[in-house]
């Protein structure tokens, strides 16, 4: 049975905050199969994700920066010093493959490449039941064309990265990759 849990942190140190949020999200879950991470543009996102990976090594972790804060079951989480939220998913039958890439010169081709990499990471040769995608604003449709050329039409969810001033300072991250 699918279970989910959420953790967050407003610690000033990005690495410590990433670790704290990831550990809190994993509480009570047998085996975390995927971790969605959303954080502040004020953090060094490479450091934040380093803390996440330290807390939950070998768990596919991915996400993006968020506009001024995140919403959790406990309410709105934000801080001038930074914030991070994580949602852990756990299910014995879950197979997760995560992949990411910089835009490149052809976002349709990038989407195709990322879909193939994610399927390989999940150990799957068939289309997933659903997928998640986050991208920079105005590029999502191009990536989706490339992804759907590989896996066909399957349900998906996700969104666009953001920053506090919508000026292009947003970040996307997956494992140890930051864009």
Protein language model features and the residues they cover:
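Cofactor- and metal-binding active-site motifs of prokaryotic enzymes
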Residues: 1-179
